[in-house]
Amino acid sequence: MLYSTYDLTAHLTPGTPAALGIALGNGWWSCGPPPGTSQPACGAAPPQLRLQLQVDGKPVLLSDASWRAAASAITYNSLYNGEHYDARTAAALAGWAAPGFDDAAWAHAVAATSAASAAQMSSALMEPTRHVSVRAPRSAHVPAGDAGAQVFDFGQNMAGVVRLTGLRCVAGANVTLRHAELLTHPPYGAEDGSLYVGNLRGAQATDVYTCRGDANGEDYTPHFTQHGFRYVEVRGAAVPLTDEQVAALEMHTDVQQHSSLAFSSARLNQLQHLVLWGQKSNIMSGVPTDCPQRDERRGWTGDVALTAEEAVLNYGMGAVYSRWLKQFADDQATDGGSNNFVPALGTADGSPNWQSAYPAIVWALYTYYGDRGAAEAHHNSLARYYDHLEQLYRASANLTAYAIGFGDWVPAGPMGNKHLIGAFALLRDLQMGADFFGGSRAAGALAQAARCRALLAAAAADFHVAFFDVAKGYYGSGLQTEQVLPLRLGIVPEPLRPKVLAHTIDDIVYTHSRHITSAIRTLTSTPTLSLAPAPAPTPAPSLYPHPYSSPCS
């Protein structure tokens, strides 16, 4: 269990009374996704506080049953579904965190007895998650046929919350804020200006503010939730809001961008812009997630296995990744395998290419930051992980029956050979292990590096025998994915490389009209093709009469 440390010195004055008030809400674990998941329902796991106040390094105050507690103005909160805030309760609790407040009617706190209360505490040792920027609306409109709603467009998908200021509403009225990344559009509905929330699935992404009826106006900023959105729909205000009263507060773990990349192409610059925003919007509470908006928002390892290099190049990820790696070690299965998402709900082996996140992060920190610390700190856990890979390899009938898992997730067309795709993960992991074990100073690291190199040589030979079609001159069934993976690994025999590469480029240009997509393929296609001379194309089929151009132009 992670804890945070705060220096309160600047908030204290000698001889002046001081009070400490803390608000607690549901976290990631409790009050989570819709029914059907393994997270507890709202209220089943009440929030807990563990606090120690030190003066000059000596404990002077601990959280115990002498503390007082009461229900707050936040009547409901969920990371996925939003927050409900009753400003009438807040008014009745005015001054609750200030000296002199009368808490005699409050109940005593109850000592926690759950397993979580005995969890080992560890310092977060990473940047905090905070509001990092404020964005004004770019435009606002009223959806067709819905005069009671206002939709504000912030012009950028982001993770965060929306702040309202100077809100005019009658006491007891509810003002709702619904969040979405898109407006309704065909084929999902008419372009009427309403929010499209189909991609949110079970996540409600709705904040509700119950007004106290202050004639001077009311302000609201959600406390214990976060949404992925570009648009917000506000409903229930007695007086329509102006753009100046609405602001988006961008949120993420406060990693700093430490590099920039610019092209002469506006399209490529926009692509890099999307990469930057997509990455930082998915670093929340130190966990790299799959999405900031729908009812998942978990630390899916496959996403990071593909993006760790990008992340460490664009942002200072050392602290976040180092802390997250500890959870990989905590959640490691008994056979050495890693999970499909971390933190995991139990220990189980994940899919090939998803498990690869563990070595991929260690390798990225070592390769781009020169950081040996992760490889050294995780040496034993990584050695068990490579024991697990070796067991999978030995049981795979020379890779022909290697573990499959998800394969090449969401391909634009047929799925490639899953055994081939799984075997790629094995070889990539072995390449990375040979690198970072080779640079580690941990006892036994050089022996681990030698093991990785030996297994890599054997598995590379098996890969070619198992998956290369000699008669047709390509791997597997000829799909792009099946070619770029061995090309990227550098395991295609040199005499065959030009033919495999030519087949790949022809497939990209003609079969898919210069289209490259899907998860694993995207990791490998562009870097592979950018290093290769483009061969002369074969004539394009009439279905795709496009003139040839380099696939990486």
Task: Give, region by region, the residue ranges found by the protein language model.
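Active-site-proximal alpha-helical scaffold in enzymes
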Residues: E296
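Active-site core of glycosidic bond-cleaving carbohydrate-active enzymes
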Residues: A19, W28, G299-A532, A540, ...
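Extracellular/oxidizing-compartment recognition motifs
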Residues: M1-Q293, G302-D303, A319-V320, N339-A344, ...
